[in-house]
Amino acid sequence: MFKFLKKIFNSSKKALRKARVIANKVQNLTETMSLLKDQDFVVKTNELKQRYQKGETLNQLLPEAYALVREATKRVTGLTPYYVQILGAIILHQGNIAEMKTGEGKTLTAIMPAYLNALSGDPVHIVTVNEYLAKREFEGKIGEVFLFLGLSVGINIKDNNTEEKQKAYLCDVLYTTNSELGFDYLRDNMEIDANNLVMKRPYSYAIIDEVDSILIDEARTPLIISQSAKETKNLYKEANRFVKTLKSKHYLIELESKTIELTEEGINKAESFFQIKNLYDVQHSSLLHHIKNALKAFFTMHKNKDYLVNQNQVLIIDQFTGRVLKGRQFSDGLHQALEAKEGVLIKEETSIGATITYQNFFRLYHKLSGMTGTAKTEEDEFRDIYNMEVIEIPTNLPMIRVDEPDFIFVTIQEKYDALIKTTLERHKLGQPILIGTTTVEVSEIISKKLAKNFIKHEILNAKNHFKEAEIIAKAGLKNSVTIATNMAGRGTDIRLGEGVADLGGLAVLGTERHESRRIDNQLRGRAGRQGDPGYSRFFISSEDELAQRFGGKRIEKIISLLQQINTSGKETSSKMVTNFFTKIQKKVESSNFDYRKYLLKYDDILRIQREIIYDQRKGILNSPHPEKIALNLMEKTINQAVVPFFTNTKKTNQPEELILFLEKSFFPKGTFDLKEVQAIFEQSPNTALTEFRKYLSNKMTVILEQQKDSFEKENNDINFFDQVIRWFMLKIIDNYYKRHINDMSVLRQGVGFVGYGQQDSFIEYQKEGQILFNKMVDQIVMDITTAILRFPLPQSFQTPPQQEKMILNDNNSDNNITKRRRKVRISKKPWN
């Protein structure tokens, strides 16, 4: 293990050493670039593009390109990127993660690799965690730098309409958010008109700001486009009413994993309450699902920590950023269970229409890189999942922040008292203070305690996130006290006011350790930017959630130790206790990493299926002649279906049975002539099958040509039939695929997904998922064939959207998936 870590460490040093050689070449061109006139920069960009087209690589162009960007940045913004920013930019171009501390200038750093990679003609996406940051860069001086260099730059945000998005995606460099990118991808793959597609260029290169937040913290949160599901509001209310009657003996909570189940007594109580014999009978599966959600809502989800209630709505709080997740809902009915718990309006439950995780979305890019101040603790995950190394970039000026050892207490109350005392002492000196909390609830507790001591302060949490920029702008001024959840202005520097450096800079006080050391480091990183002085210290207790949930039996020994060394409730430091908390964090980080890897294994099954479906959709959507695709599908389907009828061509009634089968399954009645079919059956089986297939192909071609002529004459549009065929095929695919996604979700639960870590459950999911997928593909092809061959006459045909009901009538989706078993057929390209 030590050898492996040493190898990784040496690899990072080696990468930085190589980057220095390149950075020196960039610096050596500083004087040359300073001689250029403003109008020369566009000319120089065109020259670099031509050199790339003639065969020079981006690596060969890098020194000149970066030097050009440095000079352009200086002229437009008045700021010259430091040497360390050049190092970071080189690491980004190499497809790795540049770990740059707060205030080291990640924004300027990103311009260089974005410019260089845009010279290839492929788009570059600079991805931020929120629209505020994307707008700031696009609308400010940063966007002007790209224009000065002769590149186009765009912005893609939620409020953009289709035309605005299309223009933005055509730009050389695009500023956008991770969520908008993902949703655009899903929406494009649900589109039925190619003219409305917004992402028409390849996924070439992405630079992700706050990369750990997006690829680690949000990795377990899928992007979902949902649609209305069945109405079940009464069940949520009934389950909520039942759970309110429970006592501790009726349920069992596993604190570490936050899972909850009914005990035997709880099951008996449920069966009595709902007047049923067996709660686990298949007919009560929906009721059981609602009870489980109600249990989670009541006993594992906490108001002002996991969610908040505002204007009669339940709003999710992001556990890593502290922000409200606008427009998001907890999935699988949990959100509705929380609404029932809080007595607010229960929204319509939704089912999944399309979904993708950030893990799989960003792996669509040919090259991926990222920036953050805190990635080193997660470098194994970045390497294993995304094939990116984390390279620590040195600071431009030495880091002089003082990070004091944790203050440790037995009780939370003792901890809060000491925190307030420290705040009072430093506030009297005029030193600005940032108090970091893990939840909205704790931030409000601290606020009340400060108010009792007449300390004027600002509070920044999910309830008033709209004031974030204003609060952060003042957080570094003399006498300011700011309480913040871990949203704490990430992406925005806290600048010190006049005279604050002499007072020791910003003091950061943490109210408890987070599950991840990385989040702790982010809080510390608010102080000590760009060589400024600063101070940080965490206040922790044995009653903190981290210790209670993950401490296990050792927590009792820790409490005993604390009581021995601290009999007065005063602050104390203990290396042993600090190490105990650090070990817990490492354990949780490792467990979360394992869980994300396990989730990815499951999601990769969906990814393969999704890519097959989306590839087929694109072929149909972009084809100038979709009727040819339809004819090919129809021929394959029917040709396969008729094979059993040709095993014995001498059977006297075989032609009649074949015609009956075809006209019942696919064709309109009266399509076939019995004498023509009988004549074919007079030949040998193999010859007869070959001839009949030709006969069928001719029939289908004639039907399509007749339909095409009729549709085009009726609507006076030579392209109308193509549009109708395309619409029918896409709608059939979409309706079945939406159902398939939800079936896969049911399957995931059915194979015991909650008990992850058992290889058997994954193999079962993989096998049954393939069966479901094959069945879906068969149904899609059958429906396309039948729908097209039985098209209504033109005079009765309405515009495509009004025909949706005639496409899919089979609503008998089999939810008892795990009981089915059959041989697995591997489908990679099912329709080709």
UniProtKB/Swiss-Prot annotation:
Localization: Cell membrane; Cytoplasm
Molecular functions (GO terms): ATP binding; protein-exporting ATPase activity
Top-level taxon in the UniProt lineage: Bacteria
EC number annotated for this UniProt entry: 7.4.2.8
Major location (coarse): membrane
Bias (Basic residues) ranges: 818-832
PANTHER family: CHLOROPLAST PROTEIN-TRANSPORTING ATPASE, SECA INNER MEMBRANE COMPONENT OF SEC PROTEIN SECRETION SYSTEM
NCBIfam families membership: PRK09200.1 (NF006630), secA (TIGR00963)
Oligomeric and partner information: Monomer and homodimer. Part of the essential Sec protein translocation apparatus which comprises SecA, SecYEG and auxiliary proteins SecDF. Other proteins may also be involved.
Protein name per UniProt: Protein translocase subunit SecA
Natural source organism: Phytoplasma australiense
